[in-house]
Amino acid sequence: MSSGKIAQVVGPVVDVVFANGEKLPEINNALIVYKDSDKKQKIVLEVALELGDGMVRTIAMESTDGLTRGLEVLDTGRAISVPVGKETLGRVFNVLGETIDLDEPFAADAAREPIHKKAPAFDELSTSSEILETGIKVIDLLAPYLKGGKVGLFGGAGVGKTVLIQELIHNIAQEHGGISVFTGVGERTREGNDLYWEMKESGVIEKTAMVFGQMNEPPGARMRVALTGLTIAEYFRDVEGQDVLLFIDNIFRFTQAGSEVSALLGRMPSAVGYQPTLATEMGQLQERITSTNKGSVTSIQAIYVPADDYTDPAPATAFAHLDSTTNLERKLTQMGIYPAVDPLASSSRALSPEIVGQEHYEVATEVQRVLQRYRELQDIIAILGMDELSDDEKVLVGRARRIQFFLSQNFNVAEQFTGQPGSYVPVADTVRSFKEILEGKYDHIPEDAFRSVGPIEDVLEKAKSMGY
């Protein structure tokens, strides 16, 4: 094990010099430095650059407070390794695989895997055409998720990405019954804490591993924590042959941390100040999130859209890797429609007759056509009013508004805020309900009865309570 000494510390960046013929550590190797003489307080560094003359530049995974020049640094000879396997289920830990849930730490001989790996070879990959039912009408109808696919939840600040991902955890993890890995990347600690206790109460935690590198942590930890969660998911997929659900909140923070690290390493910034290696870093992460002939990984990733600008390089780079996109729209939140999923901007590779079936496909495309026509007519309505529309257009607008409201529903995870019980709607009920609305079966029912309900039976009940 070669050793060096700290040459300089600049925030989370630490330069280490290996003199007297000591072997230089490889890129991505983990180095350990002890802050105190009795070796109880250690900090892990990851090698990022080799500067020449025996000097390497590293990124700290924890705060560098207390580090001084001249402290001894040891090369572990391998990348950061984290615990994997059944021991991780029901536990919460950080980027280094250290437990942060006040329970006993992992045993020293626990199985560990390095967080840096190659993506599966082309001939190992497998594709699936099986739909993953979410119980959320707008998703199941218009942008269905594939089992073993990659899903992105796009949205600006405060439009409901985290609530949607929590509802998906509630619906899918409980229905699916398999193993889930939740990775919190650069998000609020409070949200992670709430999610942990909620999972504990529902019993889902027993089949879930949780990894957190939150907002208050150094950029190195936020950049690498996604790989820690992914490594755990890969082990369940490859070694145990499981179908795994991988939730990541938020991929943008992974990019943001990479940008901070890049600037600290002295790289020239690229478009909008992002790191020049943005596409490479995103590709290295996303190519590992895949399904193989041993097992599947279905990933659901929240992706923050800065200033609601979808052309920003961070969300634009992530777009290319996804099977389904669920776009959250601020205008819909202003109308009180939750989840605020844009039915026209969201898309899915799975929405084809071969995968969802002919009836589902026809209903979904007709819903999109009606909503698109309504959007085109909105300018005329705003300027001239409804009276200028033809009778057919008036009927279409009425149905479009009913569809728009019916795409909303109450969430189980939001019950404590709304006071309304959440609803889980099977795909078959969703398709049947929208088909009947399109046929004009419910044109006589007031629009308000369609707002925030489950299946169409709830609409009829609500209308009855309103006196219709």
Curated annotation (Swiss-Prot):
Q: How does it sit in the membrane?
A: Peripheral membrane protein
Its principal location?
Answer: membrane
Chain residues that bind ATP: G155, G156, A157, G158, V159, G160, K161, T162
Q: Which GO terms describe its molecular function?
A: ATP binding; ATP hydrolysis activity; proton-transporting ATP synthase activity, rotational mechanism
- Has UniProt tagged this entry with the keyword Transport? yes
- Reaction equations catalysed: ATP + H2O + 4 H(+)(in) = ADP + phosphate + 5 H(+)(out)
Q: What class of enzyme is it?
A: translocase
Which Pfam families does the record associate with it? ATP-synt_ab, ATP-synt_ab_N, ATP-synt_VA_C
SMART domains named among the record's database cross-references: AAA
- Matches recorded under PROSITE patterns: ATPASE_ALPHA_BETA
What Enzyme Commission number(s) apply to this enzyme? Answer: 7.1.2.2
According to its record, what are the GO cellular component terms? plasma membrane; proton-transporting ATP synthase complex
Which key words are in the record? ATP synthesis, ATP-binding, Cell membrane, CF(1), Hydrogen ion transport, Ion transport, Membrane, Nucleotide-binding, Translocase, Transport
Q: Does NADP show up as a keyword for this record? A: no
The protein's location, in the record's own words, is:
Cell membrane
Read off the SUPFAM superfamilies from this record: C-terminal domain of alpha and beta subunits of F1 ATP synthase, N-terminal domain of alpha and beta subunits of F1 ATP synthase, P-loop containing nucleoside triphosphate hydrolases
Family (UniProt): Belongs to the ATPase alpha/beta chains family.
Q: Which PANTHER family match?
A: ATP SYNTHASE, ATP SYNTHASE SUBUNIT BETA, MITOCHONDRIAL
Role played: Produces ATP from ADP in the presence of a proton gradient across the membrane. The catalytic sites are hosted primarily by the beta subunits.
Subunit structure, as described in the record: F-type ATPases have 2 components, CF(1) - the catalytic core - and CF(0) - the membrane proton channel. CF(1) has five subunits: alpha(3), beta(3), gamma(1), delta(1), epsilon(1). CF(0) has three main subunits: a(1), b(2) and c(9-12). The alpha and beta chains form an alternating ring which encloses part of the gamma chain. CF(1) is attached to CF(0) by a central stalk formed by the gamma and epsilon chains, while a peripheral stalk is formed by the delta and b chains.
Specify the protein name: ATP synthase subunit beta
